[in-house]
């Protein structure tokens, strides 16, 4: 009885410690120590239970010894294990099972004991709990044992591991591996097995067929220079989503689009079955005659469909033109002439002429116009075919810049509302006016004393001046010794030359100065000569200094 208890506790210890070792909780040294302590405790318990041998003997072959090591791991005795053959040198097999409800359950069976130098088996069984692929089983060989063989065959790695790969393991399927090892010395041989698997997910794809249809609506007739609008309707009448739906509408010959493009492209993206989209396209007719607008729809993997509408463009109803100077100087009046005509064969009614001036423009005169801020308005009840009228507007700009005069004419006729527009742009130039002032700071002075000539250069005009140059010449009584200014300079004898100033802005002032020493008595003179791109003739200014 004592031997039986000791064996049972030994099985419990080895099973539990092996489970913890396999899960990575214990290291080898700790596992061996734990096993020794548990076996010693088993000997003590066996002595205490001697008095109950007879009662326990009857239940000897039916008792299950189960010990919970961790919440996920359970060690059980395999009651159906086959007795070892007489020529084998290992005991009955017992099983360690990982109760894992995820992908793959792994079961490992090893003998209760083995003989040093004689091989014993390690059985590993992987059970699929769901469909998995790329199942990898790794077996850590015992530290003090020699690998003999395995089924399926494999080769140990450098760190003493055996690795098997199962391409696919279905739910409920089993895969068994047997490893034979030979212990090399006495002690506990610990072995660990791990499994890694990828769940296999199967999906169903519903296939359908998109069917994109396109229709177009537009007027049968229109007037020249009056907007013509088309409606393009796109609908998916199929059973699947149409991907990357694109509508292309080339601008027909005789039409113009506000964007200036010759091909209009509309990206509709994906369209679900039954989904409908509407695109509105507006053109301006440029000539009379029949014009056909064609819209083409395409989508990923499908055929292109087209829809077209033909429109007859009638004679023009109204025309407007505006003329004015291309450029002028600031504050100088400029006259614009606005011409409105009816080149068609229909009477125009309720004609409105609107002239919109750019900000910065001031109206000097506009006969017959209603003036509101920067807008001028003329109205006519009728404009007969072939009739033409002119309106004159006198304006001026207060600041330099480019300003545009926009004219729009709106009218009604039997063919609908007719409009026409025109514009004229005038560049208003400023005028540079560069002046110079020369003064000396000390006058009179004694021989040996210094004085400073200051030269202020100012652009009083409305435009910038460029390449502004300054030269100073002094009589023999004054000797230049230093200078300062916005540009570099050089002293040569009694002359100081400053480098050209690239730009002098409107209303801008710069100052030059030259320090001079009185070298002899007399009535000295200093002459400043100023030149620039706008000064056709250089400007000079003279200052005198008395020296005694």
From Swiss-Prot:
Tell me which UniProt keywords the record has, alphabetically. Answer: Cell shape, Disulfide bond, Periplasm, Signal
Instruction: State where it is primarily located.
Output: periplasm
Q: What does this protein do?
A: In elementary bodies (EBs, the infectious stage, which is able to survive outside the host cell) provides the structural integrity of the outer envelope through disulfide cross-links with the small cysteine-rich protein and the major outer membrane porin. It has been described in publications as the Sarkosyl-insoluble COMC (Chlamydia outer membrane complex), and serves as the functional equivalent of peptidoglycan. It is present but the disulfide bonds are reduced in reticulate bodies (RBs).
Protein encoded by which gene:
omcB
Question: Where is the protein found, in the record's own terms?
Answer: Periplasm
UniProt key word Disulfide bond:
yes
GO process annotations (BP): regulation of cell shape
Q: Where is the composition biased (Basic residues)?
A: 54-63
Signal peptide limits: 1-22
Q: Does the keyword Transmembrane helix apply?
A: no
User: Propeptide positions in this record?
Assistant: 23-40
Top-level taxon in the UniProt lineage: Bacteria
Describe its assembly. Part of a disulfide cross-linked outer membrane complex (COMC) composed of the major outer membrane porin (MOMP), the small cysteine-rich protein (OmcA) and the large cysteine-rich periplasmic protein (OmcB).
GO cellular component entries: periplasmic space
Which GO MF terms are attached to this record? extracellular matrix structural constituent
Q: Supply the name of the protein.
A: Large cysteine-rich periplasmic protein OmcB
Question: Which residue intervals make up region (Disordered)?
Answer: 45-65
């Amino acid at each position: 009885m004592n031997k039986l208890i000791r064996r049972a506790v030994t099985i419990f210890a080895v099973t539990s410690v092996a489970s913890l070792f396999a899960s990575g909780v214990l290291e080898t040294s700790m596992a061996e120590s734990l096993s020794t302590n548990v076996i010693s405790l088993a000997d003590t318990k066996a002595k205490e239970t001697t008095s109950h041998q007879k009662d326990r003997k009857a239940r000897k072959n039916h008792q299950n010894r189960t010990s919970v090591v961790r919440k996920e791991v359970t060690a059980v005795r395999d009651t159906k294990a086959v007795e070892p053959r007489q020529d084998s040198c290992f005991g009955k097999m017992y099983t360690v099972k990982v109760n894992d409800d995820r992908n793959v359950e792994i079961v490992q069976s090893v003998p209760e004991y083995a003989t040093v130098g004689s091989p014993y088996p390690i059985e590993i069984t992987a059970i699929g709990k769901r469909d998995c692929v790329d199942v990898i089983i790794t077996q850590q060989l015992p530290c003090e044992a020699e690998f003999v063989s395995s089924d399926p065959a494999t080769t140990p790695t450098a760190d003493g591991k055996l690795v098997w790969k199962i391409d696919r393991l279905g739910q409920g399927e089993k895969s068994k591996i047997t490893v034979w090892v030979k212990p090399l010395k006495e002690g506990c041989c610990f072995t660990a097995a791990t499994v890694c698997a990828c769940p296999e997910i199967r999906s169903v794809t519903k296939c359908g067929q998109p069917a994109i249809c396109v229709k177009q609506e537009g007027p049968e007739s229109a007037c020249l220079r009056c907007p013509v609008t088309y409606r393009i309707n796109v609908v998916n009448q199929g059973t699947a989503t149409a991907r990357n739906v694109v509508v292309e509408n080339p601008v027909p010959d005789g039409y113009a689009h506000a964007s200036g493009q010759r091909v209009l492209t509309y990206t509709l993206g994906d369209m679900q079955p039954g989904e409908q989209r509407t695109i509105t396209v507006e053109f301006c007719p440029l000539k009379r005659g029949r014009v056909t607008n064609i819209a083409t729809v395409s989508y990923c993997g499908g055929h292109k469909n087209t829809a077209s509408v033909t429109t007859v463009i009638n004679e023009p109803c109204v025309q407007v033109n505006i003329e004015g100077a291309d450029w002028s100087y600031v504050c100088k009046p400029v006259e614009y002439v606005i011409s409105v005509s009816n080149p068609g064969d229909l009477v125009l009614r309720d004609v409105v002429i609107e002239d919109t001036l750019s900000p910065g423009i001031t109206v000097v005169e506009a006969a017959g116009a209603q003036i509101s801020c920067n807008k001028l308005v003329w109205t006519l009840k009728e404009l007969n075919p072939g009739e033409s009228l002119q309106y004159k507007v006198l304006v001026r700009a207060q600041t330099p810049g480019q300003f545009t005069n926009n004219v729009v004419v709106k009218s009604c006729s039997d063919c609908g509302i007719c409009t026409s527009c025109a514009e004229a742009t005038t560049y208003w130039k400023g005028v540079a006016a560069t002046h110079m002032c020369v003064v000396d700071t000390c006058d009179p002075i004694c021989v040996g004393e210094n004085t400073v000539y200051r030269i202020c250069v100012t652009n009083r005009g409305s435009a910038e001046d460029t390449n502004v140059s300054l030269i100073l010449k002094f009589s023999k009584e004054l000797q230049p010794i230093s200078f300062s200014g916005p540009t570099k300079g050089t002293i040569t004898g009694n002359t100081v030359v400053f480098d050209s100033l690239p730009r002098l802005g409107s209303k801008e002032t710069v100052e030059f100065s030259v320090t001079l020493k009185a070298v002899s008595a007399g009535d000295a003179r200093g002459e400043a000569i100023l030149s620039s791109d706008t000064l056709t003739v250089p400007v000079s200014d003279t200052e005198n200094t008395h020296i005694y």
